[in-house]
């Protein structure tokens, strides 16, 4: 039986459609993502915690869903907004339809609305709080009240909410078209020990580090630096994650300690912002944020352009950079800072997602730079 659904933004704009997920209510910051595919990876990206994701590509759900394409143990997005859900999901790897997947994970979603109109509204006014109600006779008054009551992501520390509860080891490399996910590698095949802070880490980041010879110990976001240093890591990885970086004082404090040791540090997304804050820079909330797999970024060191995957609502403020930081990458959309490198330490970071999943792989060599820093560090420590 087809159920109704309603999306109401905090400015009162209403979108009426049909429910394709669970019945109920979802409240969060409404953003749009321009990726043409990879909807399951987007939904399970912890960076989307407390956000309702609008996918601008009109046909979503064509290839169904499967367990291997998940980037975290559960769906992380608060809700989903799409234009059209195909009648049939067709792919040899599909285990269930997108609608079945959403219902099983208790995710509220709406289809059959004008996503072009919604996207243009968000582009002009900026990301807005919103509420989706799915079920019999959704109440617009209730939806508007819920949307207005949502506090927004500014000042919200979500890393400690989405992080792992316990440390764990990760030894699995990347998936290939030839088969299923590979078995975990032997530790003897992985010469570098990297501690990865989980602020909302995506699995493909871990896989790409393993591909480059790293055996990983993934630790909770609030793990003290002293506990990590006892593990004698060759490098420290700072993961992606949701929310505002400024309230994450525990992470900033730990990163400051690591910078004093000379251990190589590599940050992505939220980890990039945290490295900047630990180095004395500032961050700001963006009007729109960057969400999609087609964002051009200029590599200032090599004078080339990369097409990158992006997912962030905060940015490093270039006007407040200390002398110890230099800008390595800039967005060609809005000229915001996309990469930084310490001038005095083996530490660097990137705002986008070089692991893609979904998205292009132009920025994957950043992982290789991390390995180069690790090798230099190990050589100097002998």
Curated annotation (Swiss-Prot):
Residue sites binding L-glutamine per the record: 47, 241, 243, 270, 273, 311, 313-314
Keywords: Amino-acid biosynthesis, Arginine biosynthesis, ATP-binding, Glutamine amidotransferase, Ligase, Nucleotide-binding, Pyrimidine biosynthesis
GO molecular function, one term: glutaminase activity
Ranges where the Glutamine amidotransferase type-1 domain occurs: 193-380
Reaction(s) catalysed (UniProt annotation): hydrogencarbonate + L-glutamine + 2 ATP + H2O = carbamoyl phosphate + L-glutamate + 2 ADP + phosphate + 2 H(+)
Domain of life where this protein originates: Bacteria
Pathway(s) it belongs to: Amino-acid biosynthesis; L-arginine biosynthesis; carbamoyl phosphate from bicarbonate: step 1/1; Pyrimidine metabolism; UMP biosynthesis via de novo pathway; (S)-dihydroorotate from bicarbonate: step 1/3
Enzyme Commission (EC) number: 6.3.5.5
Chain spans, region CPSase: 1-189
A Pfam cross-reference name: CPSase_sm_chain
Disulphides: none
Example GO BP: 'de novo' UMP biosynthetic process
CDD domains assigned to the protein according to its UniProt record, in alphabetical order: GATase1_CPSase
Annotated catalytic residues: 269, 353, 355
InterPro entries for the chain: Anth_synth/Amidotransfase, CarbamoylP_synth_ssu, CarbamoylP_synth_ssu_N, CarbP_synth_ssu_N_sf, Class_I_gatase-like, CPSase_GATase1, GATASE
Stretches assigned to coiled coil: none
Record carries keyword Isomerase: no
Family classification: Belongs to the CarA family.
Subunit comment: Composed of two chains; the small (or glutamine) chain promotes the hydrolysis of glutamine to ammonia, which is used by the large (or ammonia) chain to synthesize carbamoyl phosphate. Tetramer of heterodimers (alpha,beta)4.
Record's function text: Small subunit of the glutamine-dependent carbamoyl phosphate synthetase (CPSase). CPSase catalyzes the formation of carbamoyl phosphate from the ammonia moiety of glutamine, carbonate, and phosphate donated by ATP, constituting the first step of 2 biosynthetic pathways, one leading to arginine and/or urea and the other to pyrimidine nucleotides. The small subunit (glutamine amidotransferase) binds and cleaves glutamine to supply the large subunit with the substrate ammonia.
Protein name: Carbamoyl phosphate synthase small chain
Species per Swiss-Prot/TrEMBL record: Pectobacterium atrosepticum (strain SCRI 1043 / ATCC BAA-672) (Erwinia carotovora subsp. atroseptica)
């Amino acid at each position: 039986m087809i159920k109704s659904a309603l999306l109401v933004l905090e400015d009162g704009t209403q979108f009426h459609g049909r429910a394709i997920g669970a019945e109920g209510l979802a409240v969060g910051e409404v953003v749009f993502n321009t990726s043409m595919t990879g909807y399951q990876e987007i939904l399970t990206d912890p960076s989307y915690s407390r956000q309702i994701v609008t996918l601008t590509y009109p046909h979503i759900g064509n290839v169904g869903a499967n367990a291997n394409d998940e980037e975290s143990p559960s769906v992380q997005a608060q809700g989903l907004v799409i234009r059209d859900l195909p009648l049939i999901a067709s792919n040899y790897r599909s285990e269930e339809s997108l609608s079945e997947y959403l219902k099983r994970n208790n995710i509220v979603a709406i289809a059959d609305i004008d996503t072009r109109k919604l996207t243009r509204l968000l582009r002009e006014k900026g990301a807005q709080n919103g509420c989706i109600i799915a079920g019999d006779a959704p109440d617009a008054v209730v939806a508007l009240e819920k949307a207005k009551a949502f506090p927004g992501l500014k000042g919200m520390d979500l890393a400690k909410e989405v992080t792992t509860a316990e440390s764990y080891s990760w030894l699995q490399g990347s998936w290939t078209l030839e088969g299923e996910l590979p078995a975990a590698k032997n530790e003897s095949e992985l010469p570098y020990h990297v501690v990865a802070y989980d602020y909302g880490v995506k699995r493909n980041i871990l896989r790409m580090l393993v591909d480059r010879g790293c055996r990983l110990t993934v630790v909770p976001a609030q793990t003290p630096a002293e506990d990590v240093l006892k593990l004698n890591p060759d490098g420290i990885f700072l993961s992606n994650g949701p929310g505002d970086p400024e309230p994450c004082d525990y992470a900033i404090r730990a990163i400051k300690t690591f910078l004093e040791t000379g251990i190589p540090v590599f940050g992505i997304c939220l980890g990039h912002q945290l490295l900047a804050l630990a180095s004395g820079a500032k961050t700001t909330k963006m009007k729109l944020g960057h969400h999609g797999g087609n964002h051009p970024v200029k590599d200032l060191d090599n004078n080339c352009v990369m097409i990158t995957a992006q997912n962030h609502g905060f940015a490093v403020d270039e006007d407040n950079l200390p002398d110890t930081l230099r800008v390595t990458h800039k967005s060609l959309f809005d000229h915001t800072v996309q990469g930084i490198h310490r001038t005095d330490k083996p530490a660097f970071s990137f705002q986008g997602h070089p692991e893609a999943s979904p998205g292009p792989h132009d920025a994957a060599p950043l992982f290789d730079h991390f390995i180069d820093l690790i090798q230099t560090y190990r050589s100097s420590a002998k």
